[in-house]
């Protein structure tokens, strides 16, 4: 069994990524192919409540089983908002879904867990503290996706059936030609590959405790996400906290739901769960954002080698849009 590896580099140009892919790829940039697996859903419902990161308000989320072909979608104020790239809106430090003037903020950790655990069809009921709110935020918990993975594993997963009581094969996007999006020296790219792999790099030269990190991961088996990615927590630089609060962000942020690193003093709330926890969390976010490629209960994360460097939610979702253009 091949385990995930961390590649340390002082400069990103020192990282050489070898990608194997077939030269006989079909002409479309992305094709939807059978996966050999059935669409799945939850075996029952599960409800959780928690504080949100940016608004600081509490919200309640109930995950429910859904029929094959329904896909993943939120229910807020009796309206349905599909967890689809068509409804993604650019917002600072999180991914937001917008439909009919209703907003669901910070969806990435929950969607990452659902995508990685194979919950293809799910009705996500969400309620805010106030019945008058036009927007609501998914709870942050400890800043990772561990709470969501525990909830999913606790209730279990079944094959989903359609209205006729039949199982439906899950289709998955295959990248046939390289696709990339970039801004200045940051980028996200998807290359043709025989299997799904994500390679991520971050670089914080002003924060030595973080520095330059690379991590490469692939879903080897069902427990890979829970073991390698899910428990990695969101992180921030201490010197940027006040600026974020002045911008109306991280009102619910604390040392209990994020790992905080100071340029001068290093990590302020150790121990880390992984030496490269910050880089792993970027992969967690990327999986959640690319889950928005999913439609009709099919896979969101494509069969491709996805390589990201210093990227954030805006670039992640931009790549997702490019992957759904054909």
Swiss-Prot record:
- Family, per the entry? Belongs to the LpxC family.
Q: Which organism is it from?
A: Arabidopsis thaliana (Mouse-ear cress)
Alphabetical list of PANTHER family matching this protein: UDP-3-O-ACYL-N-ACETYLGLUCOSAMINE DEACETYLASE 1, MITOCHONDRIAL-RELATED
One GO cellular-component annotation of the UniProt record comes to: mitochondrion
| NCBIfam families referenced in this protein's UniProt entry, alphabetically | lpxC (TIGR00325)
Give the EC class as a word.
hydrolase
Signal sequence, start to end:
none
Task: Please state the pathway this protein functions in, per its UniProt record.
Answer: Glycolipid biosynthesis; lipid IV(A) biosynthesis; lipid IV(A) from (3R)-3-hydroxytetradecanoyl-[acyl-carrier-protein] and UDP-N-acetyl-alpha-D-glucosamine: step 2/6
One GO process term, biological-process aspect: lipid A biosynthetic process
Q: Does the keyword Lipid biosynthesis apply?
A: yes
- Which residues are connected by disulfide bridges in this protein? none
Instruction: Report the Gene3D superfamilies cross-referenced here.
Output: lpxc deacetylase, domain 1, lpxc deacetylase, domain 2
Compartments (UniProt record)? Mitochondrion
UniProt-listed Pfam families: LpxC (PF03331)
- Which named protein is this? Probable UDP-3-O-acyl-N-acetylglucosamine deacetylase 1, mitochondrial
**Among its keywords, does the record have Chaperone?**
no
Transit peptide range is 1-21
| Record keywords, A-Z | Hydrolase, Lipid A biosynthesis, Lipid biosynthesis, Lipid metabolism, Metal-binding, Mitochondrion, Transit peptide, Zinc
**Names of the cofactor(s):** Zn(2+)
Q: Which reaction does it catalyse?
A: a UDP-3-O-[(3R)-3-hydroxyacyl]-N-acetyl-alpha-D-glucosamine + H2O = a UDP-3-O-[(3R)-3-hydroxyacyl]-alpha-D-glucosamine + acetate
InterPro entries to which the protein is assigned, alphabetical: Ribosomal_Su5_D2-typ_SF, UDP-acyl_GlcNac_deAcase, UDP-acyl_GlcNac_deAcase_C, UDP-acyl_N-AcGlcN_deAcase_N
**Miscellaneous note of the record:** Plants silencing LPXC do not have altered morphology compared to wild-type plants when grown under normal growth conditions, but they do not accumulate 2,3-diacylglucosamine-1-phosphate.
């Amino acid at each position: 069994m091949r385990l995930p590896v961390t590649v340390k580099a002082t400069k990103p140009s020192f990282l050489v990524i070898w990608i194997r892919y077939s030269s006989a790829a079909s002409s479309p940039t992305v094709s939807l192919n059978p996966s050999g697996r059935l669409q799945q859903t939850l075996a029952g419902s599960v409800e959780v409540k928690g504080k949100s990161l940016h608004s600081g308000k509490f919200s309640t989320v109930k995950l429910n089983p859904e029929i094959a072909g329904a896909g993943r979608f939120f229910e807020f104020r009796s309206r349905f908002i599909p967890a689809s790239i068509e409804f993604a809106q650019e917002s600072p430090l999180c991914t937001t879904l917008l439909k009919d003037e209703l907003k669901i903020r910070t969806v990435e950790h929950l969607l990452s867990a659902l995508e990685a655990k194979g919950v293809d069809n799910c009705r996500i009921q969400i309620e805010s503290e106030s019945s008058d709110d036009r927007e609501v935020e998914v709870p942050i918990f400890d800043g990772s996706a561990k709470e969501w993975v525990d909830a999913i594993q606790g209730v279990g997963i079944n094959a989903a059936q359609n209205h006729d009581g039949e199982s439906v094969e899950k289709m998955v996007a295959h990248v046939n030609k390289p696709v990339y999006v970039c801004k200045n020296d940051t980028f996200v790219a998807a290359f043709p590959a025989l299997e799904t792999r994500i390679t991520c790099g971050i670089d914080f030269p002003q924060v030595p405790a973080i520095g330059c990190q690379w991590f490469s991961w692939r879903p080897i088996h069902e427990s890979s996400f829970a073991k390698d990615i899910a428990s990695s927590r969101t992180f921030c630089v201490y010197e940027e906290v006040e600026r974020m609060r002045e911008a109306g962000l991280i009102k619910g942020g604390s040392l209990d739901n994020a790992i905080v690193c100071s340029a001068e003093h290093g990590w302020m709330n150790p121990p880390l769960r992984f030496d490269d926890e910050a880089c792993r969390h970027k992969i967690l976010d990327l999986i959640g954002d690319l889950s928005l490629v999913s439609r009709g209960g099919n896979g969101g994360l494509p069969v491709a080698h996805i390589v990201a460097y210093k990227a954030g939610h805006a670039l992640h979702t931009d790549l997702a849009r490019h992957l759904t253009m054909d």
